[in-house]
Amino acid sequence: MDPVEAYGRVKSSILEHHKWFDSSLPMIASENVTSPAVRKAMTSDFGHRYAEGWVGERVYAGTKYIDEVESIAMELVKRLFNVKFADVRPISGVVANLAVYTAFTNPGDVAMALPITKGGHISMGPLRGSEGQFIGGTAGAVRGLDVKYLAFDDHNMNVDVDKSIKRIEENKPKLVILGGSVILFPHPVKELSDVCKSVGALLHYDAAHVAGLIAGKQFQQPMEEGADVMTMSTHKTFFGPQHGAVITNDEEKFERIKLANFPGLLSNHHLHSVAALALAAAEMLAFGEEYARAVVRNAKALAQALHDEGFSVVAEHLGFTQSHQVLLDVDALGGGHRCEKLLEEANIIVNRNLLPWDIKRGRSFKDPGGLRLGVSELTRLGMGEEEMKEIAKLYRKVLLDREDPKKVAGEVSELRKRFRNVKYAFEEGPAYEY
């Protein structure tokens, strides 16, 4: 391809993407949208610079303003989560997790987490499964950990406390990880903290999905319930840039985390993202509680509305959800892959997802039986419970009534015309301007 043609096509594709999302319903639970101020910080000169090491101890010159911004980011994160120590250098949630693995384990050590099929994240997974099949999870593939699984209660969509206590006592892991990529309800941090202490295991809470809800005081508070460390990504319910952080209340543990991050894992830590995180953290301090409350309210409203429209919504007996996520079982509708593609044609952007019982019914991650829906981004656009009811009707038209998705896309576009700006920010503005 001619370089001039390639240049033009890339610019055109970026523009078309923004136009598409400006008239779509972005409902992927691991995504959100930043404010114009945060977006602008991402394109600042900070993105051209290096600042290896710790604030005040850099091995590069020219960092006095970078140090100030990173110091503010750390202070704001500590305030948000009411902790003593925060490292905001990890460039993602996965790297934040890897910092914990590096700081507190050695290759061959036993770690315990939920399997991917039960909501665990790939960063917690083993290198290979029990039958030798390649999984490639970060914990196993990168750190060389021997990953065993916590028990999961499919009916209640949560860690099975009693069975997990027994497994922890039997395996005596160095590390126990809670949290995951499917998390409808708070995980049993307090219930597992004593057994972790008794076997000498570090209790690590991965808050990648729910960090914004925790900061907004609308979810569990893992650091108050017994977690030793907490990691997060900063772009899901925490409406910042794609970045990461690690927090703790223990100074000795924090020093180990710092050394794991540098020199071990990070040289340049994406300073434009640190600046953007500082701004997002300030927004979260000012607006986070109101935002998180709206997110949970919208998730519950969407789940109930989908149920009322005739969908099989997971965990009805528990009120469906206490987080930003809603799970649909669409096995009877042709599976997650089919439903995801039909909804995408209607400009409703979701992702297919494994359900805990999918393996038993012969499904895989390529065509699972579930859809994982998120309301974080729609909430940032200002949508509320009434819009969740409208959206449930659009799902019904596409998946149950089998209307032409292209026709429904027009209705989606009409709905979105009322919600173009980012809310819960000091400077509201167009969400998908480019």
Swiss-Prot record:
This is Serine hydroxymethyltransferase. Belongs to the SHMT family. Keywords: Amino-acid biosynthesis, Cytoplasm, One-carbon metabolism, Pyridoxal phosphate, Transferase. GO terms for biological process: glycine biosynthetic process from serine; tetrahydrofolate interconversion; tetrahydrofolate metabolic process. The record marks H235 as: Plays an important role in substrate specificity. Its main location: cytoplasm. It is found in: Cytoplasm. Catalyzes the reversible interconversion of serine and glycine with a modified folate serving as the one-carbon carrier. Also exhibits a pteridine-independent aldolase activity toward beta-hydroxyamino acids, producing glycine and aldehydes, via a retro-aldol mechanism. The modification N6-(pyridoxal phosphate)lysine is found at K236. Its EC number is 2.1.2.-. Its cofactor is pyridoxal 5'-phosphate. It comes from the Archaea. GO terms for molecular function: glycine hydroxymethyltransferase activity; pyridoxal phosphate binding. The lineage of its organism: Archaea, Thermoproteota, Candidatus Korarchaeia, Candidatus Korarchaeales, Candidatus Korarchaeaceae. The gene is glyA. Pathway: Amino-acid biosynthesis; glycine biosynthesis; glycine from L-serine: step 1/1. (6S)-5,6,7,8-tetrahydrofolate binds at G120, H121, I122, E255. SUPFAM superfamilies: PLP-dependent transferases (SSF53383). InterPro entries: PyrdxlP-dep_Trfase (IPR015424), PyrdxlP-dep_Trfase_major (IPR015421), PyrdxlP-dep_Trfase_small (IPR015422), Ser_HO-MeTrfase (IPR001085), Ser_HO-MeTrfase-like (IPR049943), SHMT-like_dom (IPR039429). It is an enzyme of class 2 (transferase). GO terms for cellular component: cytoplasm. Homodimer.
